[in-house]
């Protein structure tokens, strides 16, 4: 297990990263030390290390957020909910893709069909509260038709939209190259340069560093 703290743990906010699934997906656990409220982002498979950390720190998982429908970002969601609770959340535009094994690629890639309903759907501009921290939902189609990111002022959970030095694939079901470039340019690169980007795979970066590539 590898862990990271968001900007060394500013105030009472903490961030841990766990690698999950056959695709080595970054699964993030964001939590507030005072309230113990937590949000898990993109749990692509079961993770006993994540579960142990949540229980040892007595965290209360409020949301299990899925940035998009691909199996390596969703396959552990129901398992985590069964063990620690929390609402499974996804953008409304991605709800149907979550249930479609041909779009979420679960059967063709992993050999295991994954299909389920979310507990809650959100729309662009909606906000999720963890402790005193507010996360804004940003609709970023392109990698999938209903992809999204979460932004709270100094960090961005980018899913598979924006990576260190590149962007998400656009050769998969419902993906579109023009859409992802437009979303990055008009919705993400407008954020402050010092915004830390935590992607679905690979290392972190900043908006300022990625702006130079576009």
Question: Which sequence ranges carry the predicted segments?
Answer:
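Active-site HxH/HxHxD metal-binding segment of metal-dependent hydrolases
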Residues: 45-129, 213
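Active-site neighborhood of phospho(di)ester-bond hydrolases with catalytic His/Asp-centered motifs
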Residues: 40-41, 62-69, 88-91, 139-142, ...
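A generic "binding-loop/recognition-motif" signal
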Residues: 23, 46, 70, 94, ...
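Hydrophobic residues at beta-strand termini and immediately following loops
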Residues: 18, 122, 140
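Metallo-beta-lactamase
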Residues: 104-105, 127, 134-214
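Conserved beta-strand hairpin/beta-sheet module of binuclear metal-dependent hydrolase folds
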Residues: 6-57, 149-159
